[in-house]
Structures are given as structure tokens and as C-alpha cells.
């Protein structure tokens, strides 16, 4: 094996060095403190699980992103987590089994066999929050507000948010009686805004429903889209109209809370269609080709764990958040150099300094004082009149 092969990392797998690792850790603590202040409880999920459990309730895309191995003890197939959200849903549905609303949050590394997008990380640090047990738009507003508060805390500039609802397309597709195959083909065409394909796929659909399905291609833009949708979808089935009401109610509350937030509506955007059941949302910033935070409602996931519960939440990549954010992360700087000594009084003094939050670095045998600078120390402990004193590091 060539020397270069010993340190070469796989594509999309990164190591994080100081001081960037310290910035990420400080940001993680700050965000989790923010979540806690909103009533969200922190949970830790396993890095690896049996595949049947890990992929329960998840879509095919998660299966493709999951690294798989064989457990040498049981012989069963296992997977490294590629998404923490289903694990947290299991905790709520199967482990906690609370009757009322439950608020949970998490932060941890995930591993992707396939990157989400070109040049994206395959080892992001997923961070998110989930609210279970309430089906009202108020829950969606809460988690979206928390997501935006997180972005404000990180001082991510120029954010804008996309808002949609998978129930609009799903309600129209079911009313039209589309087969699973045609529904999937139409879904793909809508994502590409391929109007000719949409028209062709809806040829055999009753005229009113065909017109509404085709209208989804162009129902994207600012607040005027909701007005146009009310007109174009006026004769839609009741679930579709209820979904429109939810989008409008959520948009109004968000605009009241975040008046400077640009809102963009795309009623044909079906991000997470096979996973989400209601409102879907994503945050974008200029110059980044994919969402930096996203989420939505996924009410059906708990059923696979024996207990269906309404659910809504969001997630982001902590490393991306730190990279894009302008918030100043205060890192400890400087330190105190402790000489190589077995003096008991010195040790007691060092313990006291560390208990006060001071950073103390011990010299190892043979290390010169010049090594203190490399250890980012600006002070030293010296013995004066029988007492160990902290003094500026000699130049």
C-alpha cells in the first residue's frame, strides 16, 4: 500500500480540525440550548441498528443512502443511520408512548452511502427537532419558527423559505383515480415543471381534475399564488381545500412573526412526497444550490412502530450551518503553561485554576518554554517566594 493511500479519505468524508471543530461544538451547544428553551428534550439514537428497524417507515431513497453491514454476532443485516428522524419517531411511538404532545431534539453524525447532491458531504452532522401528538397548523408554525430562530442564532444571511403541501397533489391524484405508476410519473414531471409531460399524463383524467393537476406546474411564486390557487382549485376535493387553508394559515402566522422573511410558494413542489403527509418547507440562501434546512409533516411514520401519531419537524447539517453563519463563536484563547514538576502545591494550584475555567497545559519532560507558544499559552506558572503565581509568558 502506498503511503498516500493510508491518509486518503473517501469522497464526501471529511475530518474536522481545530479550531473549526471547536466552533462546531460551541454552535451545537448553543442550538441545543435554544431547543431546550422551547421545551424540546434531547435524545441520543444508535449509530447502527438492524436494518428492519432502521428503515421502517422510510422511503426507498433512505434505503439507497444507508451503508449496510452484517452483524458478526447475529448474522443479521445492519445499517449505519443515514437519517435520525425515523429513529426519533420510533422513540416517541414505541419507547416513550406519551399521550400528549412530545417535543424531542437531536444532534449527531450520519453516514450516507450516496451523497444527497453533487459534492455534498456524506458525513453530515444532522441536527433537528420534532413535535409529536398534534395535527394542527400551530405545530407546523412552531417548528418552522424554531428553525428560523436557529438560523437567526447562527446569523445566516439572506434566507428565504419555500412552502408547499403534498396533500394538494395527493388529493387531486386520488380523486383522479391515478394508478401508482402514473401517479409516480406525474410526480416526476411536476418536479421538472415538464408541462408537456403533465398534459400527456392527464389525458384520460376528467377535464376539471386534469385542469387542476396541470395548474400545479405554474402555481409557484409569492403570496399571489395562494389567491390564484383558490381560483384554479375552487372545485377541488375537500382535502385539497383544507390543505390550501393550512398553507394560508401557516403563511399568515409566519409573516406576522418574521415580517422580513421572503416566502415563496410552490404547490407543485413535492419534496419528500413519499415520506411527508402535509406541509413541507425548506430554507435556501443565495449561492447554495440545495436547501440548508428543511422539514415538514409526516403523520404516518409512527404507525410502522405500532402507534400512529401526528408529527412535524425539521433538520439541518450543523457543519453547513456553521459555515454559512456569520455569528461570532467565542473560542477560549490563551492558556497557562504548567512546568514539569511533581510539587504538590503546584498541582493544587492547577486544579484550582482549572475549576475556575482556566486552560492549563502541562509541560512534558524535556519540553522547552518555547513549546508554550505552540500550545497557545500566554501565561505561565512560576514559583515566587514559595508560592506558585500566574505570570505573563516571557517573550
Swiss-Prot record:
CDD domains: HisRS-like_core (cd00773). One of its GO terms (cellular component) is cytoplasm. It comes from the Bacteria. Pfam families: tRNA-synt_His. Gene3D superfamilies: Bira Bifunctional Protein, Domain 2. Keywords: Amino-acid biosynthesis, Cytoplasm, Histidine biosynthesis. It is found in: Cytoplasm. The keyword Chloroplast does not apply. InterPro entries: aa-tRNA-synth_II/BPL/LPL, HisRS-like_core, HisRS/HisZ, HisZ. Pathway: Amino-acid biosynthesis; L-histidine biosynthesis; L-histidine from 5-phospho-alpha-D-ribose 1-diphosphate: step 1/9. Its main location: cytoplasm. GO terms for biological process: L-histidine biosynthetic process. The keyword Amino-acid biosynthesis applies. PANTHER family: HISTIDINE--TRNA LIGASE, HISTIDYL-TRNA SYNTHETASE. This function is generally fulfilled by the C-terminal part of HisG, which is missing in some bacteria such as this one. Belongs to the class-II aminoacyl-tRNA synthetase family. HisZ subfamily. NCBIfam families: hisZ_biosyn_reg, PRK12292.1-1, PRK12292.1-4, PRK12421.1. Required for the first step of histidine biosynthesis. May allow the feedback regulation of ATP phosphoribosyltransferase activity by histidine. Heteromultimer composed of HisG and HisZ subunits. This is ATP phosphoribosyltransferase regulatory subunit. The gene is hisZ.
